[in-house]
């Protein structure tokens, strides 16, 4: 089940591809205006990036409306959008079992109060190492994780690109290495990881 907004410039064949894979796109709104656009420059080792341009497009005026048939979903993945919108989505869902949220430097810098409010309502925060340090003001990984959990989430997943990811939950710590692949463009890799993480948890039912 997908909820979001795109502009009329968004290719319909991509929507049909998602539908063809069993994704219910009834929550996808097509609005007048351009689709969200981001540009960035990656370091040579692809482990960090500099945002060059963030154009919200139709996201700037997006008011998410969750279809009634979506509202009882047990698992919610709050994708990387404005924290105010993530909260608006969460307000419309009925008692989910697990809420996972993603965020990025743009929102940490520009919408921190709303982000801090959101973090008190999510179960799992998925965030990359650089942004975790930015959000917490800490550097050492143990201190970073402790601060993240103090902000609200029960679990923090800190992504480290080609080095895998760390999961922190209370006194539990788990490290998962990455499969080494030739990276062509890492844009969206973190979001795909977060979605795959929640998809597996939902399928496992644990």
What are these regions, as identified by a protein language model?
Residues 2-4, 101, 158:
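Structural beta-sheet core signal
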Residues 2-77, 91-96:
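Conserved N-terminal subdomain of the carbohydrate kinase-like
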Residues 23-26, 96-98, 122, 154, ...:
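A structural micro-motif
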Residues 30-32, 103-107, 130, 179-182:
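Short, acidic/turn-prone active-site loops that include or flank metal/cofactor-
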Residues 66, 115, 183:
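Acidic, amphipathic alpha-helical patches
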Residues 71, 120, 151:
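Structured loop/turn residues at beta-strand edges in well-structured enzyme cores
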Residues 75-146, 164-165:
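Conserved beta-alpha-beta core of the PfkB/ribokinase-like small-molecule kinase fold
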Residues 139-206:
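Conserved phosphate-binding/catalytic region of the ribokinase-like
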């Amino acid at each position: 089940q997908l909820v979001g907004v795109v502009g009329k410039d968004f290719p319909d064949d991509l929507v049909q591809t998602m539908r063809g894979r069993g994704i219910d796109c009834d929550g996808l709104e097509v609005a007048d205006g351009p689709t969200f656009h981001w540009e960035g420059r990656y370091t040579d080792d692809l482990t960090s990036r500099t945002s060059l341009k963030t154009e919200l497009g139709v996201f700037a005026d997006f008011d998410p409306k969750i279809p009634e048939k979506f509202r009882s979903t047990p698992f919610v993945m709050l994708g990387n959008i404005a924290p105010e919108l993530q909260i608006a989505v969460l307000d419309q869902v009925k008692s989910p079992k697990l809420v996972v949220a993603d965020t990025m430097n743009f929102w940490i810098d520009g919408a921190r109060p709303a982000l801090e409010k959101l973090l008190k309502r999510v179960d799992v925060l998925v965030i990359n190492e650089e942004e975790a340090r930015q959000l917490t003001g800490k550097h050492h990984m143990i201190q970073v994780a402790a601060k993240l959990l103090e902000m609200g989430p029960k679990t923090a997943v800190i992504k480290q690109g080609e080095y895998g990811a760390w999961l922190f939950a209370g006194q539990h710590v788990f490290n998962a290495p990455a499969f080494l692949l030739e990276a062509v463009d890492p844009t969206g890799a973190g979001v795909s990881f977060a979605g795959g993480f929640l998809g597996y948890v939902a399928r496992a039912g644990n």
